[in-house]
């Protein structure tokens, strides 16, 4: 690609190609800048992973989303998504659209008098360099399975989804078996009250949609989650649950989640009675 990199110059009347270099979560997190670039006069083209194309083709500020395995259309300038916080001079106090920025797909609303609907993800991609620290086992989440007033739904993809055997499926329904891309997954997530997940792309998807999400973080988390805080300036609907001591594993984190989930279920079920 011979187009020059954008370095903050005037964008009026220019076609800007945003390209993703990293994982799904990074693309979802930083596509939030597209409306700001459009407001500066750019036509914004997104070159991203195939699984995100249908979801992000309708994202605010995006004129077109192109699979990154396909050649991009002609463009005047280009920028990596992960460079946008720097290029837009973002500070912790100026992170845009923390309330959510992706349009929610149309879904059939569940009954108003239902139990609390909670999606869970226990493992990320095994190819991720930090996967052994950021993922847990489904068995470690078993203490969440018997909370009164809660219906659990698996949002787990990949090999780890095989842990959901016939016995577990009595208590946890597989909600993503028919999903082919992130738009399908977004439709599932938008039918939930809460997502509980390790540090995966589903955490970013829920936050970008403005859905309540609780994220389990290892003792040494990825840079974006910072340290010593239980909220995220990137997503206002997100709560962070951190490992205090890696030697203790995930049990203290999940026990805290069980306590908080029990309280949330009590409040929810009292409200819908």
Model-assigned labels for residue ranges:
Residues 1-273:
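Catalytic machinery of carbohydrate-active enzymes
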């Amino acid at each position: 690609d011979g187009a020059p990199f954008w370095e903050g110059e005037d964008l009026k009347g220019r076609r800007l190609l945003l390209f993703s270099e990293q994982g799904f979560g990074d693309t979802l997190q930083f596509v939030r800048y597209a409306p700001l670039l459009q407001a500066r006069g750019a036509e914004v083209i997104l070159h991203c992973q195939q699984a995100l194309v249908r979801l992000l083709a309708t994202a605010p500020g995006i004129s077109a989303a192109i699979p990154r395995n396909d050649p991009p259309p002609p463009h005047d300038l280009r920028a990596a998504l992960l460079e946008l916080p720097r290029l837009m001079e973002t500070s912790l106090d100026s992170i845009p659209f923390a309330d959510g920025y992706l349009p929610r797909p149309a879904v059939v609303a569940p009954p108003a008098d239902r139990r609390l609907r909670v999606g869970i993800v226990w493992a990320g991609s095994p190819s991720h360099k930090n996967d052994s620290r950021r993922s847990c086992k489904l068995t470690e989440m078993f203490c969440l399975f018997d909370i009164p007033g809660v219906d659990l739904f698996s949002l787990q993809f990949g090999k780890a989804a095989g842990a959901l055997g016939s016995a577990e499926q009595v208590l946890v329904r597989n909600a993503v078996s028919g999903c082919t891309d992130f738009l399908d997954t977004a439709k599932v997530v938008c039918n939930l009250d809460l997502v509980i997940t390790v540090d995966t792309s589903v955490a970013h998807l829920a936050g970008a949609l403005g859905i309540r999400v609780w994220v389990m973080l290892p003792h040494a988390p990825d840079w974006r989650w910072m340290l010593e805080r239980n909220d995220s300036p990137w997503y206002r609907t997100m709560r962070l649950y951190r490992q205090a001591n890696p030697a203790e594993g995930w049990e203290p984190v999940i026990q805290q989640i069980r306590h908080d989930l029990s309280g949330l279920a009590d409040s929810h079920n009292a409200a819908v009675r």
